[in-house]
Amino acid sequence: MPKRLLPWMALCACSPLLAAPTVPEARLQQLAADPYWIALGHYERGKLGGWRSYVDDERFFLADNGESHPDAELAATLKALYASPGLGDKHAQCVYPARTRWLRQQLQLDDLPQPQCGEYDNWYRDINPHSAVLVFPAAYLNSPSSMFGHTLLRIDQADVTSNNTALLSYALNFGAYIEGMDNSILYAWKGLMGGYPGLFALVPYREKLAEYSRLENRDLWEYKLNLTPEETGRMVEHVWELKQVRFDYYFFDENCSFRLLELMEIARPGIELTEQFPLTAIPTDTVRAVKNAGLIERIDYRPSREKELLARAEPLDHAERDWAKRLADDDSLLDAPDFKALPMPRQALIQDAA
């Protein structure tokens, strides 16, 4: 039995359930085949027919056979939505807000119980999603998983443009979870064969900026998406459903970029991005697909720390560059008579480069 059903079943033994509506089987099958429900379950057509989910974690599913039967998963979800509200944060409505919203709309579920979803509500309020940016850090040759670049999403609040507060935004990243110290050959092999679990992580954007532009000297391109606040909110709802949920991670297809395309399909149904990548999902190609889908509103560029330093050093002559290096090691030289003898504009350029 799926672990997410255990608290629900335990409470059912001593608390009455509200009656879930009786939905005709034909309608249930219609909803189970709807592209949006298929996207919420990360289902794809199996090679021998039927369905299989990209999710490799039984905790994600409410039905025992939910991994391969979208209809069974839908029926189990509908039933769980009517569990006693006393479950609180363990209630299906709290665990699956995106499923809940969609089923409520499709079936006009106006009589749902109202559990207190404190954990989810606080998490969503803290992120306060309004818009999204697709971020592309350039290739990093020291990592096999990033030799072709990488993509992540930045989730912005409403005032990010007017107050220039992008550093306070959140970065949504999907990456391989690696335990231990695998050597480079084993790392590459397991990455190619899906030997690592992949997880979503939401971290402050400033941490990713420091990692990419300063520690790894990678340039970043930020593609502002034209998602509405409602579309961005739908995407973040589903991210909550994927919290600590594992996928198999493959460097060349089921990777960071492919998973983000799935999220964009949740945000804006009908854009059909993932079907363009049946074999490989190279980050540069996925960015191009997002552009061709008309999702990009603006492009911003953030140079790496190395590029910034080179640009600052460019107007300096050899002696001034030497001063910049010395000042970087010892700022007390700002009071040196030889430095103070330089023209003020040159002093400013040297300090900027240091």
PLM features: what roles do these ranges have?
Residues C14-P16:
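N-terminal signal peptide c-region/cleavage motif recognized by signal peptidases
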Residues Q157-S162, E230, I266-E272:
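Secondary-structure boundary elements
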Residues A20-P113, Y223, W240-A354:
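Activation targets extended, charge/polar-rich intrinsically disordered C-terminal tails
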